[in-house]
A protein has these predicted regions:
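N-terminal Rossmann/SDR dinucleotide-binding element
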Residues: 1-73
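SDR active-site strand-loop-helix element
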Residues: 6, 32, 74-78, 115-121
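Active-site catalytic pocket residues across diverse enzymes, especially alpha/beta-hydrolases
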Residues: 20, 24, 93, 108
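Active-site beta-alpha loop architecture of Rossmann-like, nucleotide-cofactor-dependent enzymes
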Residues: 38, 80-84, 122
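NAD(P)H-binding glycine-rich loop region in Rossmannoid oxidoreductase-like domains
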Residues: 59-95, 107
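Conserved Rossmann-fold NAD(P)-dependent oxidoreductase catalytic core, especially the SDR/UDP-sugar
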Residues: 102-125
Length: 125
């Protein structure tokens, strides 16, 4: 099984990439992150029961089809989640959260990948 996790070294992603290895031993896990949160330690001491690769990039500007080719599932976690700061950075939040998600969804359709996407409590205001 080949799984892509966007936002892989964020708060939820850093736990998920480890849990996937135990749930799906032998799987290939492709981690995508823009390193905005600078949680580099999340990449250390990954389980050996899965094969990991890391792609640094911005979902709004990167070409996703080559990465999603042959992927079974994409778990889309990449988002700016700072509700308070989003007012001051509305364009950045819209670009990252809306356009990034749209590009992921289109690439999943074009590559016949299933898509799992999450939200946050921030959607409630």
């Amino acid at each position: 099984m080949k799984i892509v996790v966007t936002g892989a070294i964020g708060h939820i992603g850093s736990y998920l990439i480890r849990d996937l290895a135990s749930q799906f031993p032998g799987s290939e896990i492709v981690m995508i992150d823009n390193l905005m949160t600078q949680r580099f330690p999340s990449l250390f001491n990954l389980p050996t029961s899965a094969k990991y690769s890391f792609v640094e990039g911005d979902l709004t500007s990167m070409e996703l089809n080559p990465i999603f080719n042959g992927v079974d599932t994409v778990i889309h976690l990449a988002a700016i989640t700072d509700a308070a700061g989003s007012v001051d950075n509305a364009e950045l939040v819209e670009s990252n959260n809306f356009i990034g998600t749209e590009k992921v969804a289109i690439a999943c359709l074009e590559n016949a990948c299933s898509l799992i996407t999450l939200s946050s409590t921030s959607v409630y205001g």
